[in-house]
Amino acid sequence: MAKKQYFCILDTETTINDTVADFAMVICDREGRIYNQCAVLVAGHYNTMELFHDKKANDIWGYEGLNKRKAGYIAMLDNGVRMLASVNAINKWINQAIGKYNPSLTAYNLAFDLNKCMNTGIDLSGFNQKFCLWQASIGNICNTKKYKQFALDNHAFNNVTKHGNMTFKTNAEIVCGFINNNIIIEPHTALEDARDFELPILTHIIKKRNWQDNIVPYDWNKFQVRDNYKA
């Protein structure tokens, strides 16, 4: 009998200093059943540093969005949905999860989360297998004509660059929307993003034959709207 395979979905929300403020991991199997999860605000980071924001932005990452996000976290702490945890406590949880499940680690833009965790002292070195869920999405979902048509139909485009290029969005919000045929706005809180957006993407991808052979880096040239638009 084959040994049961588990996955660990990692998601983080960060501070202005490139460390982790909001940390989550979800342990699941191939069918998407959740066996364990960790969702905490990181002591010494969430409560001592400003959340990441962009003063030029006018969306969730701008000043107005920053105030809403801060209020949201305070409410989560007040109602018990989140608690503060030290980096040492997080590392103990991770080690216990690896010991029990030996899961493959994944995240939507894994390199980003690995870097922020390293900056914070969160130790992810115990995972034997890792892959980027964004890259898996690019090769298994986003490169398809159906996905690009869905993005066109829903105007899921990134902002035009100074060189006049506009690309399709390939973020978890749109990819999950494609899978469910219903786009829901990501809250950009770690647990909810991992559980409600990245988990459905993961289970969709790993049902595909040879999905691991189609893990490819994002290449913006392949997602230019002008190359896929038919007037």
Which residues does each PLM region occupy?
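Conserved non-catalytic scaffold segment of RNase H-like nuclease domains
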Residues: 2-118
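A short, structured active-site edge motif that brings together acidic residues
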Residues: 40-43, 128-142
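Conserved protein kinase catalytic core
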Residues: 17, 138, 199
